[in-house]
Amino acid sequence: MEVKVLGPGCAKCTEAEKIMTAAIAEAGVTATIEKISDFQQIAKFGVFSTPAVVIDGAVKCVGKVPGKAEALAWLRN
């Protein structure tokens, strides 16, 4: 599983990355997590509001920090 957190490095983006990292550990899934801060790469996902979370190429969340329960649901499905 490949998880990407998109954002310029703001506080909310950092929080989203921490939540996704904790959710991966709690779910017990094998996943890599990548932080993408380059706006051209972010735009390729059709994302224009950050933070955003992408899992295996699918945009799951845009413009908000996901809740841990929400993140766990994405990882388990």
Predicted regions and their residues:
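Conserved helix-turn-beta segment immediately C-terminal to the redox Cys motif
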Residues: 19-32
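Short, surface-exposed acidic/glycine-rich loop or hinge patches that mediate macromolecular interfaces
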Residues: 10-11, 36, 65
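Acidic, metal-coordinating helix/loop segments flanking the phosphotransfer/catalytic sites
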Residues: 41
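Local sequence-structure signature of Cys/Sec-based thiol-disulfide redox active-site neighborhoods
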Residues: 1-22
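Terminal leader/tail segments of proteins
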Residues: 2-3, 30-37, 73-74
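Structural micro-motif
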Residues: 46-53
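Non-catalytic, surface beta->alpha helical segment in thiol-disulfide oxidoreductase systems
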Residues: 55-77
